[in-house]
Amino acid sequence: MVKNPFSFRSAPVTFWTTVTYLALLIPIIIINEGTPPAPSEESPIRGTNLTQAWLDLSTLTRGYHPYNSHYNDDLRGSGSDNSEAAVTVFDDLSSNCTFLMSSGVAPAPNTPQVAAYFEGTNILVYIRGKSDDQGRWWDTAAVHDSKQNEKGLTLYFTRSENQPERGIVVMLNNGEEDYLYGARALGQHPLNPYIHTFLNLEGAGAGGRAILFRTTDREVTAAYAGSPDPFGTVIGSDAFGLGFIRSGTDYSVLYDVFGQRGLDLAFFKPRARYHTDQDDARHASKGSLWHMLSASIHTATRLSSDTGDTFIGPRSDGASGKVHNGSPSDGVWFDLFGKGFVLFGLRGMFAWSLTVLIATPLILMLLSYLLHRADKYYLFSSSVKPGDQPDDEALPVGGWKGFFRFPFALVVAGSLTIGAAFLMRKVNPFIIYSSRYSVLAMMVSLFYFSFWAIMRGANFARPSALHRVYVQIWLFILGWAMLVAVTVAEDRLRIGAEYMFVFLESSVFLSLFIALCELFALPKKNAWAQKMRDEQEERDFHRGRLHSPLSSSQIPPPVPNQESTPPGTRHSNHTASTPTIRNEDEDDDAAPTERTPLVGGNADPTRTTFATTYRRSISALVTRARRYSDSDGAGLHHDPFEREQAWSGRLPSWTWFLQFLLLGPFTITLAAQTALMLVDAVHQTGADGSSLLMPYLIAALGVVLLLLPLAPFVHRVSHHVPVFLAAVFAATLVYNLVAFPFSAAARYKVYFVQAVDLETDANRVCYHGVEEYVRAVVDSLPSASGRDVDCAGGSKKAGLVSCCFDGVATPPRLTAGASGGSGKHEEEGYGHLVAVNASRTGEHAARIEIVANNTKACFLEFEKPVSGLSVHGSSGWDERFGQYPDAGVKNVRLWHRRWDEKWVADVQWKDAEGEAASSSSSSSSFSDGDWEVLGDEDLRKRAEGLKGTVVCMWSDANVPGTIPALDEALRFVPAWVAVTKLSEGLVEGRRRFEV
């Protein structure tokens, strides 16, 4: 007989669950690790040239090109004439901004902050839309017409057949990497008020798929939804909104400050190559380039094709000073296998969540009530009486068996998995940096095996047919409690990242509904108890018959003779249907007749023997069985599975498969995609000083969610899979504990800076990172051999240490990269690199003039905060980024667009009593300490002065020999190390001043 392939037995459960997990996880991993293949043709979309775009990327990454480098200028001026239609190019060499530099953490009250002055060099390309006004409707300052020199996205829209419905502005942003300076400078450009939506192409990694990092609302996300290969989830958007991700992109300025609506499309891995010498075309792929380009073209086309009022009209927040681009709505979105894209409104999910919260418990309670009325609610029943008599003995039902197994198993297995995360953090915290799949495999195998062992062991000791339904009840309770928090977050915080829990609770409800409906197939509890009592009585009867001689009291009364007497016979006075029954009151000594036998007596002709008595007892059993079957419809030929409760034989054996389909595939897909995306995003952030525990906790929680759909069925999984996973756990645990965490493919990033004292010519080379690995880097450098290496905290990056040594063997030649510069002047000292002239312009006011050689960036650091700041040439303080702080500013970052140009900054400060003085000294007050002796008896009142330091940055390392310490590092550090800059400059030159 062929067994049901979907029955709830060990072999089918093991097969279907294992196949389902493998069929889902393998393609998800492949999609996560790969990129869509690049088209073989040169122009896969008419108007694009993938080959030319790849060559442009190769040119762009041929050298280091930060804002403060000569190669940046070279790239800005390069281009070729490839457009079919003229475009308007705004070569912005006039916009500048002075603003407050906010941080990801709100500053404490009365804490001095940081300000910046930046001169932009953005290039904006305006592509006229079909519905745009004709003519030059903008302010024509800084416009160069018909410079057709942009490629990629710009080239596509400049073709006549691809002209957008509404105009598009393509901004080639310069100065983004250091502090989003280019986007801030856009705020001063005349085109900015006309920009309603944006698509920001970003890079937080060096390849892979371009992820939809975050979006402002549902409507702009809909423009991305039809992309050929969508990739991303709303979780990233909410993580930014809640402050879990502190790094910023241009999105932060365009949306938060200017009020524009749009999207962030970004490369986000591998993080280890980001901002290193491997952040180039060689370590990228055409597939990555095509993935971003195709998504960009589709999204920009959809945004510019909206001719309605979706992105036009009054703002819903009523904010003044921001573009009027309509009323957005919050959205929830995620991709499926890199091909499908799900998008719906947050308010819709809130309504759905509220419905699930309220309706599902009521439905389940109603179903439970119906089961109770039908006397088939075996859950939570310990015993049942076979009758209504008080003296009836209650029979055990076993309805509580399996109730407490799931929470115990979940706590133990979850604790072991999270404990493994803490173990990794303690013993080998960076192993996830290069071996994230080994860590994930360890956690999956640990949770699976430990959870299975507890559930299988409990079911072996006390088999229960209610095991599955109890697990689903627990899942429903936990999911319902989680959904309460999710619903509050949806309504109050406008967060949609918890969509997975809404889907999970909905599927758990449907699965539990089916599980409760299964109970209708069971016999009534009272009927089952009556049957059990009858069977027990029969067993007791047979036990007595087999082990003791028959007595008259044990022998059932004889069955009446059914033979009828034919009419006209001797006993013809009886009807044919009337049995001949012996009258027990008759006299046994009746007078004999001539018919009386010679031997024997006048006994009843119906004789009782052992055989007839046995046949009569069997007949009684069959009669009772038929009566039980007729009363409930449940036969006696459905045996329970193994040693489960006797009443459970009628439970359907195939419904588990339907429940698994509801619980498994969709939840597994969402959990796997989300866990991989989050682990990919954070597993290499430990080198930046971020939490080393967080990646492991994310992996552990992702594993728990991934395997949770298996919980109701895991006790029927055979031992083969768990034992194999136990071996996997042992192997991966040993590897994760002892393996070296870095490799040439996943290099540890150390942060380099060389600090030069421009007054004493002393210089120190510093590497920032985790001390254990930084010391290994320093030990590999010839210039550090035999020198004292000081490692201490206080790094600009939290959680890292700074290891420094004397850089006398590798002095920088900071003018070598300049036009006509040779760097020979540095042999005589560094004093000529920066000239500072600080002079008083008032009692508490001063003018600081700075001239620096071969750099565009110099910073001011004051010992006490300044209450006023004005930079010559500035367009004024931009209050869109925050008002000037009452506590003042202690740091000012100054950026020029041209080399060797003078900065002039006027500053004011407050006296000891906290009042700013005017230009007249008569309004000042002084304490005794402000008097100093100028002669024998002459005293003069002196106002408080201002001390500070000018720090200039050099970032151009394209010419070998400019920064020998960096050249040495790139040549001699181990293959598992990548060197990148600590902050804005590779070399920092410091000069003090006082007024």
UniProtKB/Swiss-Prot annotation:
- Tell me which residues bind Zn(2+) 2: E177, H275
EC id: 3.4.-.-
* Species in which this protein is naturally found: Chaetomium globosum (strain ATCC 6205 / CBS 148.51 / DSM 1962 / NBRC 6347 / NRRL 1970)
Please give the residue ranges for the topological domain Vacuolar: 32-349, 424-437, 490-499, 672-693, 743-995
Q: Which GO terms describe its biological process?
A: proteolysis
Pfam families, from UniProt? Answer: Peptidase_M28 (PF04389), PFF1_C (PF22250), PFF1_TM (PF22251)
TM ranges are: 11-31, 350-370, 403-423, 438-458, 469-489, 500-520, 651-671, 694-714, 722-742
Q: Where does the UniProt entry say this protein principally localizes?
A: membrane
Q: Which cofactor does it need?
A: Zn(2+)
Q: Which molecular function term from Gene Ontology is one that the record holds?
A: metalloexopeptidase activity
Residues modified by carbohydrate are N49, N96, N837, N853
Active site residues of this protein:
E176
Provide the function of this protein. Answer: May be involved in vacuolar sorting and osmoregulation.
Cofactor comment text: Binds 2 Zn(2+) ions per subunit.
User: Signal sequence: where?
Assistant: none
Instruction: Kindly give the membrane topology term recorded for this protein.
Output: Multi-pass membrane protein
**Matching SUPFAM superfamilies:** Zn-dependent exopeptidases
Q: What is this protein called?
A: Vacuolar membrane protease
